[in-house]
Curated annotation (Swiss-Prot):
Name of the protein: Ion-translocating oxidoreductase complex subunit D
UniProt organism field: Shigella flexneri
Regions crossing the membrane: 20-40, 42-62, 78-109, 123-143, 148-168, 214-234, 242-262, 267-287, 301-318
Chain coiled-coil ranges: none
Record keyword Transport present: yes
Statement: the UniProt record of this protein carries the keyword Phosphoprotein: yes
One term under GO cellular component: plasma membrane
UniProt-listed Enzyme Commission number(s): 7.-.-.-
UniProt subcellular location: Cell inner membrane
Membrane topology field: Multi-pass membrane protein
PTM annotation (FMN phosphoryl threonine): residues: T187
Gene assigned in the entry: rsxD
Annotated InterPro entries: NqrB/RnfD (IPR004338), RnfD_bac (IPR011303)
Alphabetized Pfam families for the sequence: NQR2_RnfD_RnfE
C-alpha cells in the first residue's frame, strides 16, 4: 500500500478563511469612515468600483478554470483586495484606474499563481504599484483634507469627477486640490519631501496648512488613528498576530527618531512617519496578510522590522513619498528565506 504525504497545511477550513476576511472588512470601517470624513465621497465610490471589479474578475477567471465560482467568492478575499486598493488611491482618481488596478491585482497577482494561498506577493499592493508607476500624476493627486480645503466636492460632484474629470460647475482636479492658502495641496509626506528638496527649512515646512494637525498632518493623523483602532480590534479578535504590526511600527519609529535627531533639517519627525500616509493601514491590514507574510513568530518579527526599515528608507531617500507598497512587496520577496532560517527545530533533532 502506498501512502501519499501531502504538504501542510493539513486542514482547510473555508469558513475560517471567510470569517477572518470578514473580520478584516469589518475592522476597516473606522478607517473608511475617517477617509470619508476628511476626503469626501470619492472614497466610497472607489470602494464600490473596486469591489464590483474584483468580484467580476475573480468570477471570470474561476469560470475559465472551471472551478466553483460561488464557493470561492464567499471567502471574501476578492472583496478585501478591492477594498485595500480602493482606500490606497486618491479618492477622485479616474474610474478606469481603480478598475484596471483591481483587475490586475486579482487576475495577474492572485489567480495567475493559482488563487488564494498561492500568491507570493500582496495582490492589492501589486495593483497599487502598477498604477503608481504607470500613472504617477493621477496616483499622487490627493485632495486636501476638508479642514484645509477651499472646494469640498459633494457626492454628485465626486461621481462626476471620477467618471468625467469635471464637477457640475466645470471645476477640475486642479481647482479641487487648492488649500486655504491658495496652493495646490499634497499629502504631508509628499509636501515634506518636495519642500526639503526645494531648500525650505523644516521650520518653514511645519507652518504649511497641511501640518496644522495636533500630532502630524491635518486629517491624516485621524485617518491613521482610525486604522489603528481597527487594527487593535483585529488583535483583540485574534484575527491577526501582534508580531508584524509591533515590529514594523517600532522599527519605523526608531529609524525616524534616529534620523530626525541626526538630521532634523532634512528628515521628518517620527510622528509624521507614524501618523501620515498608509502607515497604520500597512501595519495592520496589509503586512499581516497570512499568505504573503512570514509564518513563524521570529520570522514575523523580522518581516515587520524589515518592512519598517524599508518604509523609512524610501520615504527619506527614495523617489516616492510614502513607500509602504514598495516595502511590502520587497519584504514579500524575503519571506521564503526568512521562513527557512526561522523554522522551528523538528522534535528529536539537533540544531544545525
Amino acid at each position: 500500500m502506498v501512502f501519499r504525504i501531502a504538504s501542510s497545511p493539513y486542514t482547510h477550513n473555508q469558513r475560517q478563511t471567510s470569517r477572518i476576511m470578514l473580520l478584516v472588512l469589518l475592522a476597516a470601517v473606522p478607517g473608511i469612515a475617517a477617509q470619508l470624513r476628511f476626503f469626501g465621497w470619492g472614497t466610497l465610490v472607489q470602494i464600490l468600483l473596486a469591489s464590483v471589479s474584483a468580484l467580476l474578475a475573480e468570477a471570470l477567471v474561476l469560470k475559465l478554470r472551471k472551478q466553483s465560482v460561488a464557493a470561492t467568492l464567499k471567502d471574501n478575499s476578492a472583496l478585501l483586495t478591492g477594498l485595500l486598493l480602493a482606500v490606497s488611491i486618491p479618492p477622485l482618481a479616474p474610474w478606469w484606474m481603480v478598475v484596471l488596478g483591481t483587475v490586475f491585482a486579482v487576475i495577474i497577482a492572485k489567480q495567475l499563481y493559482g488563487g488564494l494561498g498561492q500568491n507570493p506577493f500582496n495582490p492589492a499592493m501589486i495593483g497599487y504599484v502598477v498604477l503608481l508607476i504607470s500613472f504617477p500624476v493621477q496616483m499622487t493627486s490627493w485632495l486636501p483634507p476638508h479642514e484645509i480645503a477651499v472646494n469640498i466636492p459633494g457626492f454628485i460632484d465626486a461621481i462626476q469627477v471620477i467618471f468625467s474629470g469635471h464637477t457640475a460647475s466645470g471645476g477640475d482636479m486642479n481647482t479641487l486640490r487648492l488649500g486655504i492658502d491658495g496652493i495646490s495641496q499634497a499629502t504631508p509626506l509628499d509636501t515634506f519631501k518636495t519642500s526639503v528638496r526645494a531648500g525650505h527649512s523644516v521650520e518653514q515646512i511645519m507652518q504649511y496648512p497641511i501640518y496644522s494637525g495636533i500630532l502630524a498632518g491635518a486629517g491624516w493623523q485621524w485617518v491613521n488613528l482610525a486604522w489603528l483602532a481597527g487594527g487593535v480590534w483585529l488583535l483583540w479578535q485574534k484575527a491577526i498576530r501582534w508580531h508584524i504590526p509591533l515590529s514594523f511600527l517600532v522599527t519605523l519609529a526608531l529609524c525616524a527618531t534616529l534620523g530626525w535627531l541626526f538630521s532634523p533639517e532634512t528628515l521628518a519627525a517620527p510622528q509624521i512617519h507614524l501618523l501620515s500616509g498608509a502607515t497604520m493601514l500597512g501595519a495592520f491590514f496589509i503586512l499581516t496578510d497570512p499568505v504573503t507574510a512570514s509564518t513563524t513568530n521570529r520570522g514575523r518579527l523580522m518581516f515587520g522590522a524589515l518592512a519598517g526599515l524599508l518604509v523609512w528608507l524610501i520615504r527619506s531617500f527614495g523617489g516616492y513619498p510614502d513607500g509602504v507598497a514598495f516595502a511590502v512587496l520587497l519584504a514579500n520577496i524575503t519571506v521564503p528565506l526568512i521562513d527557512y532560517y526561522t523554522r522551528p527545530r523538528v522534535y528529536g533533532h539537533r540544531k544545525g
